[in-house]
Amino acid sequence: PYAYRAAYLGHLGEYHCPSCGTARPPLDVGAVEVRLAGMAGSTFVLAAGGQRVALTTVLPGLYNVYNVVAAAAAVLALGIPLPIVAAAVREFTPAFGRAESMTIAGHPAYMLLAKNPAGFNEVLRTALADGRPIVAVIAINDLTADGRDVSWLWDVDFEMLSDRCRLAVVTGIRAHDMAVRLKYAGLPQAAVVVEPDEGWALRRGVEALRAGEPLYVLPTYTAMLRLRHILARRGLVHTSWED
């Protein structure tokens, strides 16, 4: 197995093989001086071809710094000048459901799509970044676009919620599976509520919030579409095709 000097996200990091000497190749494009600001976004310096430019993105989380760097690497390879790349990053806004922000009953709310273990881990780290226990609505479906097999939930590090989640309202087709996963992650029984109806799940999450406290909505793909449909009917978000 690889040995890591630093592991940043999943299997990504500064690695080498102690046996054969294989190692991460030198970077053509990278991010340095990364500063994460929770749901407020991130700042970092994009380094490419001997040039460096300071960037701010509204996209939260280290995983989105990786996404920005990957997109920058692709367009730089096509010959787009770095200043144009930097301007595009600064003007970018997230797609619906991906770190989407809204206000529900006077509270800030954030929707963070999660589709696989590595992504869900980063979503959880981002939601927990300010150090306060959170209130979350976790919506899990198992339709074709989500993946029929939900055993991947056992590969997500939900244990990080064990003492940092004041309430988790689980909903969606596989709400009970999610509740079982949280039980074995160490969440107290009183901290997990099963509410199969997505609209009522949102309501129960909001009702549990204290003044100024945000709600984190963590859905799989089709659950995200269902939740946004409910929120759009209430006039809280645009319908997807209007974004």
Please place each PLM-identified region on the residue numbering.
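Extended acidic/charged loop-beta regions that coordinate divalent cations
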Residues: P1-R52
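Glycine/charged-rich beta-loop-alpha catalytic/anionic-binding loops adjacent to active sites
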Residues: A48-T57, M102-H107
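General secondary-structure propensity
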Residues: V53-G61, A191-V193
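Membrane-targeting and insertion segments and their boundary/processing signals
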Residues: G41-V45, L59, P94, W152
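Short glycine/threonine-rich catalytic loop with a Thr-x-Gly-x-Asp
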Residues: L59-A70, F96-G97
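ATP-dependent carboxylate-amine ligase
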Residues: L9-R24, A73-L82, A87-D243
